[in-house]
Amino acid sequence: QVHSFSLVGQDGDRVTEASLSNRPYVANFFFTECTGICPTLRTRLTAVQKAFDSDDLTMLSVSIADQDQDLSKLKAYSKVNGIQSEMWKLVTGDSNAIQHFALDSFGARLDLNGNLYAHTETVYLVDAHGFIRGLYNGTLEVEIMQLLNDLQILVSENLDVT
């Protein structure tokens, strides 16, 4: 289960586990200057953003880079990449908060130098109660298709409850 956390979104809003409760969300780790897997991951997640309404789903991309603590950088990244901030939260925080969040909630690892190794292709599906329900390789279209199917089930379950 995702533990309590408090991070800051690209619009300066506080994003917590409580603010994400009552609907499923998709989470991943990234940084704005990444030229490796992040562009592919972002493109695939854009398809998820387009498939659902912001009332049904939240997307959470957690920056692991210190330089992304400048919210104007996250805001610019959001704008350039067509990220709808009411649905897709790009969040940051101090390094310790992000490290604890990644380690405690998502089972991230530390590398041999003790640095956070959370920047992977993994996308996490979290249900409305904060339980991780699936892990997907966000760079693969087939995995994103499975994520979309699983999300549809969770959204339907959530609509039946509310």
Which role does the model predict for each range below?
Residues 40-101:
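Structural microenvironment flanking redox-active thiols in thiol-disulfide oxidoreductases
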Residues 1-18, 43:
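N-terminal "domain-start" segment that seeds a small globular fold
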